[in-house]
Amino acid sequence: MASVATNGAAVESNDRKRPFEGARNYRFKKQKKEKDQKDSVLKTEGTHEEVLLKDVEALLKKHFISETLAQANGKENGTSKTDPSTSLPAPFTEIELTVQEISSTGDGLALAPDSKQVYVVPFTAPGDKVKAKVVRHFAKQNYSITDFISVITPGPLRDNSLINCRYFSACSGCQFQMLPYEQQLAHKKTIVEKAYKNFSDLAPELVPPVADTIGSPLQYGYRTKLTPHFDGPPGQKRSDGRKGIKRKFEEVPPIGFMKKGTRHTIDIEDCPIGTDAVRMGMKSERKRVAAELDKYAKGATILLRESTKRLPKDPQPQPREDAILEDRGEHFHEKTCVTDQKGRTTEYIDDFKFENPAGAFFQNNNSILPTFTQYIRDHILPPTSSGDAPQKIKHLIDAYSGSGLFTITLSQLFPKSLGIDISSSSIEFASTNAALNNLAPDHASFIAADAANLFASIEFAADETVVVIDPPRKGCDDLFLRQLLRYSPARVVYVSCNVHTQARDVGVLVNGMEGVDGGFGPGSGVYEIESLVGFDFFPQTGHVEGVAVLQRRREAAEVEVGKEV
């Protein structure tokens, strides 16, 4: 069969740049990191490399078991094979591979014939026979990085008619455009499952079945923030010692996103996962940069952030050239693109209104947020069908509260809600958002607290309180988990953009921490997992948002009551 084209994406030459992997003080940083990990109960960081290595090891183990059985059968029949060759192809060699599975990092994993080396091939699906170019071997870890060149024979899951971007298979932004959406959701369920298997340190019986991934209403046109960039003029770095040479742009540089596995920027004029307003802003900003190129002495990142203005139906608003007008039934939404980091954006989640600095963090897929926040509302309180007397949970604590998404959208369930963040600017905007949504300070309030004393000023009774945590990708640290276990609220809802660090942290909450709750053994901590599910905030990519609901164990609750008595 003829090779399937790579959607116009050129194959990079052999002399291309690769991400810098070293540093002058790398050895010292590594030693400090190893010491910190030794002193911490958190023994993993859930990095891309750690996740990939777990999948590589699992594939090799599965392959080795199958191979051992085959060899045993061969010996019985007198047809035992000789040992396979252990030599590896030289870098930049083109090879043919058949993809076995997709890793939790979003890349395909393949085993070459007669090889115990796993090849990582981006933009591929199980069953694909592909041509790939070897980039680098990690012999000790038994895997190799490759570049995708083309599909020779597509596997049963691949459907190239679904691809909606000419830069797919080159741009690093999307990994799954060739997969039907139901297959993307199924794969993301396995990401959550493997995260808890590989990183939680929990016995299988302590981890409930992961629910089916909840999909996004929009699979394209959903992303409300994009940050394309361009590099500085060629030769911008100092080339004559201390003096340096100031370079000017001689032509408009590529403006877009990184080519997969490199530091090269691809010139991308449009991104189909962006909302219409963001895509409109991308086109206008590309024109502006080209017209004002003499103002730039170095590269820059361009902010594209959607903002929404809610307009009444009467009088009907007039369309604007720089805005997208959407009919939302009872009102119109006028969507514009904000490009000033210091500007403000407005977003609506159902009827909740949020204002934020354009450059600040806020969820980037508004189409799924109503479903997402409703799920949290439905699961934040104990289930009423448990047979036990319902716990009277009166208080919400929103740790890592940011601009108040959970504090505000969950406020109707609690007499008092408190958002906590270490950023004073986030707290300022959260307080503003509470006022915008007519929440009195005695109903929903916010405080900026130092990480070392996050719960020090909390007066809510622990058995009447639920805590929502939504940390950054690195997850919680030792100190926060220690404080949370000492406080021991009745329930914890853990939201995470990195299910691997979430699994690690949830494992600590379930197994406990020595010297804090008397735990530190299989399931001997304060909490048990009630439910696990993934949300697809970023269709066409390998990312999944995880939600874990934890309930304080009955024995722990009885100990807490005993303390109060």
Language-model features: where?
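Extended interfacial segments that mediate partner engagement and assembly in macromolecular machines
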Residues: 152-153, 159, 163, 169-290
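Rossmann-like S-adenosyl-L-methionine
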Residues: 3-16, 22-26, 37-70, 274, ...
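Flexible glycine-/small-residue-rich
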Residues: 150, 230, 259, 304-306, ...
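Terminal RNA-binding accessory module
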Residues: 2-162, 167
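A short catalytic or substrate-binding loop motif that flags glycine-/basic-rich loops and adjacent residues
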Residues: 91, 101-104, 126, 218-222, ...
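Structural motif
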Residues: 112-114, 259, 349
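Hydrophobic beta-strand signal
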Residues: 131-133, 227, 303
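A short, compositionally biased
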Residues: 102-107, 249-253, 338-343
